């Protein structure tokens, strides 16, 4: 959007792309999604996609890149094209897409890390209330807002603030619930929430921060 190359943005599910449910034309650019024939350009960083697909000129894939956003950023010239003010945001995007969070980022999230959790549907905030605008609409708004505002200014937005307040309201209850309902066997932790009247919202990495020797989790709902 910074380069005025797009006129419409859609967020779609990877499985819907694979199943052919999303109409793709030669005027489309896809990012962080499975490759589909007929697309103009497809950007990705998943090794599985480079294995699944034969090499194509319009499939811009760098398996060593920390994020698909980084692949797009470098393809279009990096900081020779984009403003230096994007630097902090790009580091945060790399961290979120590759899940390179520190334990404290997960337990007590702040800044860009916190924003990524708030915007992730898997955090579960939507189960608790109807926000003034949907997560989808907020994502669309933030595409423009993030270009010219600091993370502090982003968190001052009313639509972001109400999500922060809800997350923090249930933060301790969510941690207690995971510790009470989870059992670990070797490197696998099973979270059984079938008997819980309320499933409290928290980021999807919390279970690994609370059970740091586990690297696989199974959720029973």
Language-model features: where?
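Long, charge-rich alpha-helical interaction segments
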Residues: 121-161
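A broad, low-specificity signal for short, low-complexity segments enriched in glycine/proline
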Residues: 149-153, 177-182
């Amino acid at each position: 959007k910074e380069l005025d190359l797009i006129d419409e943005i859609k967020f779609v599910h990877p499985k819907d792309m694979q199943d052919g449910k999303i109409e793709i034309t030669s005027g489309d650019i896809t990012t962080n999604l499975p490759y589909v024939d007929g697309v103009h350009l497809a950007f990705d960083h998943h090794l599985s996609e480079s294995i699944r697909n034969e090499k194509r000129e319009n499939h811009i894939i760098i398996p060593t890149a920390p994020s698909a956003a980084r692949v797009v950023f470098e393809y279009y010239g990096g900081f020779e094209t984009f403003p230096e003010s994007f630097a902090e945001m790009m580091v945060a995007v790399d961290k979120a897409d590759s899940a390179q969070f520190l334990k404290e980022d997960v337990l007590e999230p702040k800044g860009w890390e916190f924003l990524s959790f708030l915007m992730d549907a898997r955090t579960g905030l939507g189960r608790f209330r109807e926000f003034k605008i949907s997560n989808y609409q907020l994502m669309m708004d933030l595409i423009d807002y993030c270009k010219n505002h600091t993370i502090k200014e982003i968190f001052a937005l009313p639509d972001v603030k109400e999500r922060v307040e809800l997350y923090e309201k249930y933060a301790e209850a969510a941690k207690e619930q995971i510790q009470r309902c989870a059992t670990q066997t070797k490197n696998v932790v099973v979270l059984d929430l079938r008997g819980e009247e309320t499933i409290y919202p928290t980021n999807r990495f919390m279970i690994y921060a609370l059970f740091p020797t586990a690297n696989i989790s199974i959720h029973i709902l």
